[in-house]
Amino acid sequence: MYWLSRQGLPRKAGMAASLGTAVHASVEDLLLHDISHIKDAESGWLPEFAEGVLKTRWEEEKAIFHATPRRPQWKEDKWKDAVRNQRGAVMMLLDHVGVRSLEQDRITGALWRRIQKLAIAVEGELKTSDGRLMGRLDLLMGDINDEGELVGWLVADLKTGRTPETELKTDVNRQLRMYRDILLANNPSAPNVRTEGWYTQNASKWAAHGENVLEQAYDAWQATVPTPLPMEPTIGDSSCGGFCDWKAWCPHWWNWRNDNGTLHKSDFSDAVVLLQEYDSNTGSAVLELCEPADANGRAMPTGIRQS
């Protein structure tokens, strides 16, 4: 999976990813936009402005989605989810300054400028001094005390996916700690640094705790330097049985599903097919399911047709 991801192959577009990108970009726009024309005590301006910014990003993502050859169907009814996720992000920004429950139509120009000033970095690049490890951090916020003095930094990573039930997933916790540790390595005199996953669906914050992960990250980097030939595959339910952008170029998932009897079994499953008939007027088609003929992924028609 990793080797294929480094070969410059086209990714498959996904509705969840497009929604997440639109929400992320709209929040960044809200934090970076010049609102000097908004008076300090002026309220009622943010909801309409925020939705307009989100709509612009939504349409951008829709255009990119439709220009992607490998894509499912765009779901316009997900717009309401995008609005809810953006509002969740704004609620967490309000929480950062102690007014979480404030109705968003009561946000004043002065309050939003205060939040903007606490945003030290928005969509910033994180990279170790040797250039080997890097990442994109959504927000670096200043932590202040009751006197308004800067006492720390907060790495906040916006998440539009499913909210954790009890704790952060191991990989997400590791990702957030790597952001923290790169930041500390590059800024040895930094104040206290903490990191959180900000889940926009329900505006909940989840702290990442644990030891420094840079040594492990360097070991992983060394082990995954791209090679001319693919690495040994890790075949199993956690890879071949789940979501993967690279199935179109990998024979292993297909053979794995065929061998364990799960090929063509579920309502939502990937398949290799022959297109036997296609009506361009109606979009209807007749497909013939294929099975792997060998370990290299050569397709063998089964005679089973679906329309």
Give residue spans per PLM region:
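Structural detector for short beta-strands of small beta-barrel domains
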Residues: 261-288
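Beta-strand/loop nucleic-acid-binding surfaces
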Residues: 290-307
